[in-house]
Amino acid sequence: MSDQITYNPGAVSDFASDVGSRAGQLHMIYEDTASKTNALQEFFAGHGAQGFFDAQAQMLSGLQGLIETVGQHGTTTGHVLDNAIGTDQAIAGLF
């Protein structure tokens, strides 16, 4: 049958875990960048400073969105795997 789905549960699980780990790494980058940006406020003032901090805030907002998307992708992959395994087990019980 050409409409069958074949998957490797171990590989899918590893992928979901890896994606979740990447979200954690991105979050650490976010925290580090936000901390360093906030530390600059004491030393960086003047006409261009507000533009810099606005740009940093926009970049951090985008990074936060990426972190949430990557984390959700890992979580969703894990849920789909759990559901696929559950479906396989339920179908096996029918025979």
From Swiss-Prot:
Q: In which compartments does the protein localize?
A: Secreted
SUPFAM superfamilies reported in the protein's UniProt record: EsxAB dimer-like (SSF140453)
InterPro entries in alphabetical order = ESAT-6-like_sf, T7SS_ESAT-6-like
Give the residues annotated as coiled coil: none
Record flagged with keyword Secreted: yes
Q: Does the keyword Secreted apply?
A: yes
Q: One GO CC term of this entry?
A: extracellular region
Membrane-spanning intervals of the chain: none
Judging by the UniProt lineage, the source's domain of life is Bacteria
Record key words, sorted:
Secreted
Q: Which family does it belong to?
A: Belongs to the WXG100 family. ESAT-6 subfamily.
Q: Can you name this protein?
A: ESAT-6-like protein EsxC
